[in-house]
Amino acid sequence: MKTMFYEESEEGRRWIDVETNEDGEFDVIFKTQAFAPDGGLYAEVSRDILGFGFESEKDAEKCAETAAGQYGF
């Protein structure tokens, strides 16, 4: 797994990872995790698949870069 983009705010944190799947291909995942009222992090991490099945890590990274622009990183 390789974190391509990361951002933290008052609400929580969000990031885009490039992960290797069980088939040895690369997937691009957008993840978010909210802060709890006590300032800690909620255990749940939401995951949205932005792209999957890339044979090349470079192609997955290009997808992550495009997505980062769309998500305002």
Regions found by a protein language model. Give the residues of each.
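Short N-terminal "domain-start" leader segments
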Residues: 1-38
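A short, exposed loop/beta-hairpin motif centered on an aromatic-Gly-Thr core
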Residues: 2-6, 33-35, 41-59
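Intrinsically disordered, low-complexity, compositionally biased regions/tails
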Residues: 16, 28, 43-44, 55-57, ...
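Short arginine-rich
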Residues: 67-73
